[in-house]
């Protein structure tokens, strides 16, 4: 949404078409940041890890109503319900990953409470629009001490609003990989938060 109410789907459509042609299933990551919207309440610019093609802002939406409108338009285009779908859609998007590694400031400039609000809000909006949607937890960036500390606080407050837990295998400063891809420690953290859900590893550094 480059401007309020002006939705441009070309880039996303290309990914969806490619996935359909190659029989791939999409896990779509939702970023709740639009430049025009963040400017409206004078959010501070941020340096993105993804360069110039990505948003210059990484804060909580200024207006959750505007964000909800974006979410509804997004899901409506790719849910495969036959209404307002992308032309030629044959393989709907069912799996939605709400945000990415929010404990890293290069991906999210907000508090734990901000993330919790955005995540729970997004999940409920998506499920209302697409009842069979599967919500994937924003990927945890490994199980380093700071990540564990972050998710220990956050997990109990979002656990009712996701279907699949999500861990990313991030190597340490020494470049060494965790032999269990962090899944063992992540499973223990989930158990401590009374979360009993499937675990997906959606990023891996080797």
Locations of the language-model features?
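Substrate-binding cleft and catalytic face of glycoside hydrolase catalytic domains
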Residues: 1-162, 166-172, 195
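Catalytic-core region of carbohydrate-active enzymes that cleave or remodel glycosidic bonds
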Residues: 164, 170-206
């Amino acid at each position: 949404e480059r401007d309020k109410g002006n939705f441009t789907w070309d880039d996303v459509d290309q990914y969806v078409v490619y996935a359909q042609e190659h029989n791939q299933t999409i896990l779509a990551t939702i970023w709740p940041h639009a430049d025009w919207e963040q400017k409206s309440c004078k959010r501070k610019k941020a340096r993105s890890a993804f360069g110039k093609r990505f948003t210059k802002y990484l804060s909580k939406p200024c207006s959750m109503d505007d964000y909800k409108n974006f979410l509804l338009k997004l899901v409506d285009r790719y849910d495969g319900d036959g209404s307002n779908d992308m032309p030629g859609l044959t393989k709907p998007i069912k799996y939605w990953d709400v945000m990415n590694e929010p404990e890293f400031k290069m991906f999210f400039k907000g508090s734990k409470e901000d993330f919790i609000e955005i995540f729970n809000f997004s999940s409920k909006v998506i499920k209302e629009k697409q009842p069979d949607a599967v919500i994937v937890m924003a990927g945890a960036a490994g199980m380093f001490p700071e990540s564990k500390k972050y998710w220990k606080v956050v997990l109990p407050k979002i656990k009712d609003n996701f279907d699949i837990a999500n861990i990313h295998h991030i190597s340490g400063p020494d470049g060494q990989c965790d032999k269990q891809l962090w899944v063992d420690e992540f499973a223990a953290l989930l158990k401590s938060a009374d979360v009993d859900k499937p675990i997906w590893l959606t990023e891996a550094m080797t």
